[in-house]
Amino acid sequence: MGALFGTDGVRGLANEELSPELAFKLGRAGAFVLQEETGARALVIGRDTRLSGDMLEAALVAGICSVGVDVIRVGVLPTPAIAYLSRAPEAGGGVVISASHNPYEDNGIKFFGANGYKLPDRLEDRIEHLVLTAGGALPTPSGIGVGRVREMPDAMERYVRFACGTGPSDLAGLKIVVDCANGAAYQVAPQVLGRLGASVVPLFDTPDGTNINAGCGSTHPHVLQQAVPAEGADLGLAFDGDADRLIAVDEHGRLVDGDHLLVICGRHMRRHGRLAGNTMVVTVMSNLGLHLALREAGIRVLQTKVGDRYVLEEMLRSGCCLGGEQSGHIIFTEYNTTGDGIITALQLLKVMRETGRPLSQLAAQMERLPQLLENVRVRDRNAVMSSPALWEAIARYEHGLNGEGRILVRPSGTEPLVRVMAEARNETLLTKVVEELVRVVTEIDRQQAG
């Protein structure tokens, strides 16, 4: 990570940390680098429903056109839809304006190459260098050399048709409650499921620019958990603001997180000979229960640090076709080049259709060990993480778990947070360990602030 780019592009408070001026510079530098690397003549631009999206899109479009690259605007669409459309013959890459699961005040910018993948560190570093040091040296064509802006009127329909082709052909008889998070999936997700024949009950599908992720979506599924049994539905699906992640709810209103989804899909694919190398990729945050359930099924697990980009890198390196995170970022490389909440939902529904089993039974394949996660807001997450006192405390409390649990303390890649996570069979001990480590982190942060 550099001064601008984090684990998922550039993010910050819109109009302050992520200003129109910075968006303009990112547009210029990003378009120049993609043009130089792949000969890109046009970039697809999409966004989520945040109020600041229009402002940042205008600045970004101006920057891209100012170096002679065309823009294809597609409006509000999920991040994975932009990844898919970036591979279209008329495109040479794409840009998404979104801050995913963050509150509406934040926004972000991330780039995709012509292959539909997020840019590697090497290219992000190059863009960052140009933004910070050499932006004025970039080309400034005039006359017919300036980039043009055009629309892609059938952008949503292209993605809907693509998504429908990846899942079960008929969902008739299934009732599904869909929490759209007032975000980028608010039109697409109900449309895909409805076209396949499901009875869809939409929730949080009226974005107003300020209500994205507000008490809804994959990070706040409590309303969905109540709605599924109340509606007599077969399951619920919750997306985040840009719909690159999915959390499900079974027919009884119980959460089915990313770890469960990986186990359900991975074991089914293994059983049908569709799991490449009988191997999956997960992160260090995955529950111990996932490892036990996959080991029982004869599935090998590769681990990475947190972040879907690292999961994808390992999948491509090792030839795996399924990987993901507990948070619901699930990647099926057979279908898309990034985490895709709608594709994940369709693969889950495919398992339900092919097995004839309700989601509660499928989720029971994994027993989740008690896990507790606390986010501690700090002034300097990297300074806290480098404190010897923190690592001494971690070692001390890890020893106290007697080999029946684990501790993971890590900085957030996108926010000023230190995440304290622990797992243990003894829930009382688990709570005590996390509370003590939160206290240690808070005290270290206070001391460092002077």
Curated annotation (Swiss-Prot):
Cofactor binding description: Binds 1 Mg(2+) ion per subunit.
List, alphabetically, the HAMAP family matched.
GlmM_B
Keyword Oxidoreductase in the entry? The reply is no
Sorted alphabetically, which InterPro entries does this protein's record hold?
A: A-D-PHexomutase_a/b/a-I (IPR005844), A-D-PHexomutase_a/b/a-I/II/III (IPR016055), A-D-PHexomutase_a/b/a-II (IPR005845), A-D-PHexomutase_a/b/a-III (IPR005846), A-D-PHexomutase_C (IPR005843), A-D-PHexomutase_C_sf (IPR036900), A-D-PHexomutase_CS (IPR016066), Alpha-D-phosphohexomutase_SF (IPR005841)
Cofactor(s) annotated in UniProt: Mg(2+)
This protein's UniProt keywords: Isomerase, Magnesium, Metal-binding, Phosphoprotein
Phosphoserine modifications at: S100
* Function field: Catalyzes the conversion of glucosamine-6-phosphate to glucosamine-1-phosphate.
Name the Pfam families on file: PGM_PMM_I (PF02878), PGM_PMM_II (PF02879), PGM_PMM_III (PF02880), PGM_PMM_IV (PF00408)
Q: How is it modified after translation?
A: Activated by phosphorylation.
The molecular function GO annotations come to: magnesium ion binding; phosphoglucosamine mutase activity; phosphomannomutase activity
The record's EC number reads 5.4.2.10
Catalytic residues in the record:
S100 (phosphoserine intermediate)
What's the protein called, per UniProt? Answer: Phosphoglucosamine mutase
Endpoints of the signal sequence: none
The domain of life is Bacteria
Q: Which family does it belong to?
A: Belongs to the phosphohexose mutase family.
Q: Catalysed reaction(s)?
A: alpha-D-glucosamine 1-phosphate = D-glucosamine 6-phosphate
